[in-house]
UniProtKB/Swiss-Prot annotation:
Residue span(s) of the pro-peptide: 1-2
Protein name per UniProt: Ribulose bisphosphate carboxylase large chain
Top enzyme category: lyase
Species annotation: Coleochaete orbicularis (Charophycean green alga)
Predominant location category: plastid
């Protein structure tokens, strides 16, 4: 045998393949305050012990590979390796387990959600020993979260900028989402803002298409904002989507929005990417722009119960990367969202400190320290009859966004906006008077209809509209 390949006594290296669990399954490990903790829902292939599967997840998402390598001896694996420190069976499921993995902080670059995700979920989800794998939650320690700027401004600063307090904010996505000219688009924005909404919004797939180039849209929308502000005396905004094919083009659009003097822009953070999103967030803080975030493509990643990444993880990632608003589902509308699960990640977006609560899908206590909060945006298939439930579920620190529920009003856009504003004001007043929105919501709306013909017409149109389908992603 060549002396270059011979295994010598005492060197600690022996070529070959060994079980992951011999190195990466450490049930005796006590987690550190600085560890990043992950909860994976894993479904091993038949015949693969859960300890081996959990150890494989820890190994392949940190320092491990499929065989022993001699360069392991050139570093301290014990310092850098991920550790599967606990495994528990999932109640009611055969061959499904929650594996808890601890990662040392030194594995991750500061201020980089991109690097965090590349490490933890970048490779291991295709591992053959696993039939399915889902990242259910992450615990981000303050030692790591404090390296991030977080949201450009946060909830309180946004309220101060808008001078609006004590109620949810009202929005509307302009429809049809594609096909309008820039001038007609601006007209719809003006009518909605003039009717009483706080915000209007570009749809997530409105970028710069042949029927409406971005610069034309920005100019006509800015005119609509300033005209509606002058007539109502309220600060108004429109989420101008800066998402583009390159980061450089995205920044050019953001800069033009700032030059126009508008208050808020928008980004599709999953399709645009975390690196672009963090750059845009930093620009928004430096230049006084609010940043609305759309989660386009999220259901591809988070909707299946057994495989992918839960949205609570994507929400935490967004809070670190930066955004002042993010779409969160509605509970009552057309899009997926179980109530307790939705409220769990809404709290993770807004609050400073969130206790572990498995009944809401929260696997770890999360301390954001001083990082600003993010406003959840309820949007998708909602209308005036939903207003009491939305006000009760989401509270004041939220944006309630009605697209078809505004523009579908039989009398037009402005009356649709009036109907939503009246319904919201009625619900907030009733709540402040001590009435139960959950039980008396319909009565509150009917009473408001008596002095608002716009609301009465909206109630008549949507009185039978419901989206009653079973939620796929349950606890």
């Amino acid at each position: 045998m060549s002396p270059l390949t011979e295994t010598k006594a005492g060197t600690g290296f022996k070529a070959g393949v060994k079980d992951y669990r011999l190195t990466y399954y450490t049930p005796e490990y006590e987690t550190k305050d600085t560890d990043i903790l992950a909860a994976f829902r894993m479904t091993p292939q038949p015949g693969v012990p859960p300890e081996e599967a959990g150890a494989a997840v820890a190994a392949e998402s940190s320092t491990g590979t499929w065989t022993t390598v001699w360069t392991d001896g050139l570093t301290s694996l014990d310092r850098y390796k991920g550790r599967c420190y606990d495994i528990e069976p999932v109640a009611g499921e055969d061959n499904q387990y929650i594996a808890y993995v601890a990662y040392p902080l030194d594995l991750f670059e500061e201020v980089s959600v991109t690097n965090l995700f590349t490490s933890i979920v970048g490779n291991v989800f295709g591992f053959k020993a696993l039939r399915a794998l889902r990242l259910e939650d992450l615990r981000i320690p303050p030692a790591y979260s404090k390296t991030f700027q977080g949201p450009p401004h946060g909830i309180q600063v946004e309220r101060d900028k808008l001078n609006k307090y004590g109620r949810p904010l009202l929005g509307c996505t302009i429809k049809p989402k594609l096909g309008l000219s820039a001038k007609n688009y601006g007209r719809a924005v003006y009518e909605c803002l003039r009717g009483g909404l706080d915000f209007t919004k570009d749809d997530e797939n409105v970028n710069s298409q042949p029927f409406m180039r971005w610069r034309d849209r920005f100019l006509f929308v800015a005119e609509a904002i300033f005209k509606s502000q002058a007539e109502t005396g309220e600060i108004k905004g429109h989420y101008l989507n800066a998402t583009a094919g390159t980061s450089e083009e995205m920044m050019k659009r953001a800069q033009f929005a700032r030059e126009l003097g508008v208050p808020i822009i928008m980004h599709d953070y999953l399709t645009g990417g975390f690196t672009s999103n963090t750059s845009l967030s930093h620009y928004c803080r430096d230049n006084g722009l609010l940043l609305h975030i759309h989660r386009a493509m999220h259901a591809v990643i988070d909707r299946q119960k057994n495989h992918g990444i839960h949205f609570r993880v994507l929400a935490k990632a967004l809070r670190m990367s930066g955004g002042d608003h993010i779409h969160s589902g509605t509970v009552v509308g057309k899009l997926e969202g179980e109530r307790e699960v939705t409220l769990g990640f809404v709290d993770l977006l807004r609050d400073d400190y969130i206790e572990k609560d498995r009944s809401r899908g929260i696997y770890f206590t999360q301390d954001w320290v001083s990082m600003p909060g993010v406003l959840p945006v309820a949007s998708g298939g909602i209308h005036v009859w939903h207003m009491p439930a939305l006000t009760e579920i989401f509270g004041d620190d939220s944006v309630l966004q009605f697209g078809g529920g505004t523009l579908g009003h039989p009398w037009g856009n402005a009356p649709g906006a009036v109907a939503n504003r009246v319904a919201l004001e009625a619900c907030v007043q009733a709540r402040n008077e001590g009435r139960d929105l959950a039980r008396q919501g319909n009565d509150i709306i009917r009473e408001a209809c008596k002095w608002s013909p716009e609301l009465a017409a909206a109630c008549e149109v949507w009185k039978e509209i419901k989206f009653e389908f079973e939620t796929i992603d349950t606890l």
